């Protein structure tokens, strides 16, 4: 496999991923993603210990332990473009050798938990209600830029497009199902 070009993998002189300003050792396998920077400390204050606190631009990272388990909380800022940067850079941290710029043959998977605010269409769901979503819908078309679109719920997406009379001039929406394993972790607190 050929090394990635400098424009494909932007790292600092200190071998940190550029936007997040992080090293591999500074993140956990379980990562809570929040939009707002202030939410990072609101969550990490419940950690038993904090080993790393890093901030670069709107990206704030706290990594520590909670009940003996290593966990990170990272702010992405607002919008799917920022979340895309965060997830791609975290993936690079664990799946690319920064010295050779070659993608590892054995890829590591991280567990992401998105924690944020949402509107509701149901009257019985009040403001500030905690929810765990089984599905998410994207309107910006970002998922279509990635090869692995098997995660898109095609039948549900097509039904939504038809029902909403989605305009063809807009990016095609997509619906994805949350990881059953992740939902179970959150609902039953088996790991946290």
Where are these regions (language model features)?
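Metabolite-binding pocket within alpha/beta catalytic cores that recognizes anionic/polar moieties
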Residues: 2-175
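Active-site-adjacent substrate-binding region
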Residues: 179-192
């Amino acid at each position: 496999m050929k090394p990635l070009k400098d424009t494909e993998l932007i790292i600092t002189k200190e071998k940190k991923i550029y936007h997040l300003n992080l090293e591999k050792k500074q993140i956990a396998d379980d990562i809570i993603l929040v939009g707002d920077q202030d939410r990072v400390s609101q969550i990490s204050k419940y950690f038993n210990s904090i080993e790393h606190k890093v901030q670069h631009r709107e990206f704030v990272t706290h990594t520590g332990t909670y009940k003996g388990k290593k966990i990170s909380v990272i702010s992405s800022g607002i919008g799917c473009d920022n979340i895309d940067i965060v997830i791609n850079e975290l993936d690079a941290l664990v799946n690319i050798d920064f010295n050779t710029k070659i993608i590892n043959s054995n890829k590591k998977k991280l567990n992401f938990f998105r924690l944020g605010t949402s509107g509701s269409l149901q009257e019985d769901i009040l403001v500030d209600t905690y929810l765990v979503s089984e599905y998410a819908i994207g309107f910006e078309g970002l998922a279509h830029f990635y090869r692995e679109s098997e995660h898109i719920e095609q039948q549900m997406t097509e039904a939504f497009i038809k029902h909403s009379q989605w305009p063809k001039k807009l990016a095609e929406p997509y619906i994805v199902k949350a990881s059953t394993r992740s939902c179970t972790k959150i609902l039953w607190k088996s790991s946290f």
